[in-house]
Design a protein with these regions (language model features):
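ABC ATPase nucleotide-binding domains
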Residues: 80-86, 90, 94-240
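Conserved coupling/switch loops of ABC nucleotide-binding domains, chiefly the family-specific signature
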Residues: 64-67, 117, 217, 249
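ABC ATPase nucleotide-binding domain
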Residues: 12, 33, 69, 353-355
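Non-catalytic connector elements of ABC transporters
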Residues: 245, 254-370
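Conserved ABC transporter NBD signature motif
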Residues: 66-74
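The feature captures the beta-strand-to-loop junction immediately N-terminal to the Walker
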Residues: 43-45
């Protein structure tokens, strides 16, 4: 799945399993490595195991089996306060009775640093998050975004080996959340600190990460760079979870090297798709196709897949039109159409042709409902 070599790993989960009741496992034989300076995101729905992994790395949960290694040393039996790990939570966890300066000074005082060094580090950390003039304020006198910047600065001020972030932007509004994504990414690139980030928000993961581990049911479904996850999902779960996606269920009738033929719509249409994760001829499959890969009324002979479609809904979004169509019996087929004069006359109820390349359609494992 793109794991780095263990000899290069800065953080390493080695055959880690976790159970709370001794029977059902919330983490199942996890092997995951992160490089020094990497921004690695654990992405998945609620209950997928991503937060449990983060808590085990932080020391707030213990692995039932397996080993967790940080900078070449096993930390299974190292208490949280001795792991030299910074943490940023969704609820900020700032001390309300202390000023911003005092909040940042606290982890340094615990480490018994000299007063002048504490003052220098606090000053530098606040300037780093553009809050140099806010040191005398208390958390309640700050906006949500400012509080989150303070939380990030506090996690970095003692120069930890690694920073863990658990849904840190979940409490912010959409605009501020997007702004903080870029600020955290910029800080990471500037400081080259190792960050392990947990979220269920795919846009956060795609925006900030070097690599993303997609979790489901305690198992990593795919580990890859953001563009690879989006363009080349390895299974149906990843295809559905990352980005907007059209799915067409069918049966494989032929395989020719890297391209297979799939019957869909009760055998009324035969489509060609890239072989990715199928069980062979006669097996059920799910074709995954991104909306932006579909062309409306393509030129004759230009696409191997061309089918009839009925326009159901059109939504104007400025630079493009989002159209919901009925295709191969599915009335939730989405097409992103460039906003041009050529397509300006489309109306609900229109009959059109839609086409796409075989390489843009990925034949994956069938969903459980098929």
């Amino acid at each position: 799945m793109g794991n780095i070599n263990n000899s290069e790993a800065y953080v390493s989960f080695q055959n880690v399993q976790k159970t709370y009741d001794g029977e059902s496992f919330v983490i199942k034989n996890l092997n995951l490595d992160a490089e020094r300076g990497e921004f690695l995101t654990m992405l998945g729905p609620s209950g997928s195991g991503k937060t449990t992994c983060l808590l085990m790395l932080a020391g707030f949960e213990t692995a039932t089996y397996g080993e967790i290694v940080l900078d070449g040393t096993s930390i299974n039996n190292v208490p949280p306060h001795k792991r030299n790990i910074g943490m940023v939570f969704q609820n900020y966890a700032l001390f309300p009775h202390l000023t911003v300066n005092e909040n940042l000074a606290f982890p340094l005082q615990v480490r018994k640093m000299a007063k002048n060094e504490i003052e220098d580090r606090v000053k530098n950390a606040l300037e780093m998050v553009q809050l140099g003039d806010f040191g005398s304020r208390r958390p309640m006198q700050l906006s949500g975004g400012q509080q989150q910047r303070v939380a990030v600065a506090r996690a970095l001020v003692f120069e930890p080996k690694i920073v863990l972030m658990d849904e840190p932007l979940g409490a912010l509004d959409k605009h501020l959340r997007e702004q903080m994504q870029y600020e955290i990414k910029e800080l990471h690139e500037k400081l080259e600190v190792t960050i392990v980030y947990v979220t269920h928000d795919q846009s956060e993961a795609l925006t900030m990460s070097n690599r993303i581990a997609v979790f489901d049911d305690g198992v990593i479904q795919q580990l890859a760079a953001p563009n690879v996850l989006y363009e080349a999902p390895e299974n149906a779960f990843v295809a559905q979870f990352i980005g907007e996606n059209n799915t067409l269920s069918g049966k494989v009738t032929d395989i020719d090297k890297e391209i297979c033929t799939v019957e869909v719509g009760d055998g009324k249409e035969s489509l060609r798709a890239l072989v990715v994760n199928i069980d062979g001829i006669g097996s059920n499959t799910m074709i995954s196709l991104r909306p932006e890969r579909v062309v409306v009324n393509p030129e004759s002979g230009s696409y191997p897949n061309v089918v009839s479609a009925e326009v159901i809904e059109l939504i104007y979004l400025g630079d493009h039109i989002r159209s919901r169509m009925k295709v191969c019996g599915h009335d939730d087929f989405i097409v992103k159409i460039p906003n041009s004069a050529h397509h300006a006359q489309l109306q609900p109820g229109n009959s059109v042709k839609v086409g796409w390349m075989a390489e843009d359609a990925r034949a994956l494992d069938a969903l459980e409902s098929t």
